[in-house]
Amino acid sequence: MEFLVKSVRPETLKTATLVLAVGEGRKLGASAKAVDDATGGAISAVLKRGDLAGKVGQTLLLQSLPNLKAERVLLVGAGKERELGDRQYRKLASAVLSTLKGLAGADAALALGDLAVKGRDAHAKARLLVETLADGLYVFDRYKSQKAEPLKLKKLTLLADKADSAAVEQGSKEAQAIANGMALTRDLGNLPPNVCHPTFLGEQAKGLAKEFKGLKVEVLDEKKLRELGMGSFLAVAQGSDQPPRLIVLQYNGAKKDQAPHVLVGKGITFDTGGISLKPGLGMDEMKFDMCGAASVFGTFRAVLELQLPINLVGLLACAENMPSGGATRPGDIVTTMSGQTVEILNTDAEGRLVLCDALTYAERFKPQSVIDIATLTGACIVALGSNTSGLMGNNEALVRQLLKAGEFADDRAWQLPLFDEYQEQLDSPFADIANIGGPKAGTITAGCFLSRFAKKYHWAHLDIAGTAWISGGKDKGATGRPVPLLTQYLLERAK
């Protein structure tokens, strides 16, 4: 889809479909009023008949209005004045896209810039709008014998006042990069596990480096992981025929002496639970257990597209967790790269076992910040549901920055504590630490486990178990989160 920004009067624009907003109580914004005047009150007449109440997301298509170059006018309800928030604005945008998809026109122009969205300026409104539209165009039908019909719509133009055009352009540019990153994340998450395994992800990284020249990729194999002393990482992979990989991504958009930000992604390409086997019902969704790593891919794609002036490192800890005669057993003790020993009480608490070695590996980059992203605990879904990611960290300023980024990007997180009392749940009589802390506060104790390997830098942990994918039903699939949050965090660091 091509997105453009133009500063023209809506009544003079030649387009297949002109989109205008109408509030409840027949409220017309400046753009709708201009078109209404040009058509001799055609819009007002329709509203007086009660064909459109103006509730958020209601649509009404008008054909061939007089004195317009637009072939059609699509009216969309914007709700009550001064009550339009992010959620309602996204609903409005989705309703517009749903209608446009069913039309024959190859282009459309959206005159929505005069809508007041609470707490959002022209830049933020444009970004929210374009991101919603672009993400709404996503289709995954790679393995369908009957593909989706090609979309007739090829171009969307945002109409903006001249004073706002630069801000709208920038918002649109950022949104397209974020949406492209989300699409990559969703594609990788939605792939079947017989295709998407650790070696495949290494090849995908190399492919991304070919697309963007500023990206360097190194793929560490099983031999190298053993040389590094990553006993915890290797323990997760030892039951599978698929070899593990630590994928290292490096982008240098700033001066070489500027410390990088590091993103660490959990990449369990399929999680059976290992010897601590999961129930069969819903196990197919454990292909999404690599969505942390997929979100690092997606965030890198967005950063590379925007060419942000920052230095960024990605560490993707990729393995498959399978039961076999050679698999790790409950009760096994392994030595991590840090030298700390871990008693593995449950092989289904494997994400933290690959992440801990990756977090130790991150030390060599002398980072400004390290953020790990993982579909780590079912307890996070119990605590926060599927709307909000869990967030913990050892530096309050970093945590606040991520919370702020999530609010702006409409990809929110919520902070959970890492009090010392929770650390005691991880005590082991046989090793330095146990990999689970009992039934209470499971998300927090998982964060406590990771914190033991992140003491040499500012670190935060995002638990995306509830937000990375949608379970069951027709909408089942990866969401692309938290690419918007992470990209916004890096945009702010690049200023």
From Swiss-Prot:
PROSITE patterns: CYTOSOL_AP. SUPFAM superfamilies: Macro domain-like, Zn-dependent exopeptidases. Keywords: Aminopeptidase, Cytoplasm, Hydrolase, Manganese, Metal-binding, Protease. Its EC number is 3.4.11.1, 3.4.11.10. The gene is pepA. Binds 2 manganese ions per subunit. It comes from Pseudomonas aeruginosa (strain ATCC 15692 / DSM 22644 / CIP 104116 / JCM 14847 / LMG 12228 / 1C / PRS 101 / PAO1). Presumably involved in the processing and regular turnover of intracellular proteins. Catalyzes the removal of unsubstituted N-terminal amino acids from various peptides. The keyword Ubl conjugation does not apply. Pfam families: Peptidase_M17, Peptidase_M17_N. This is Cytosol aminopeptidase.
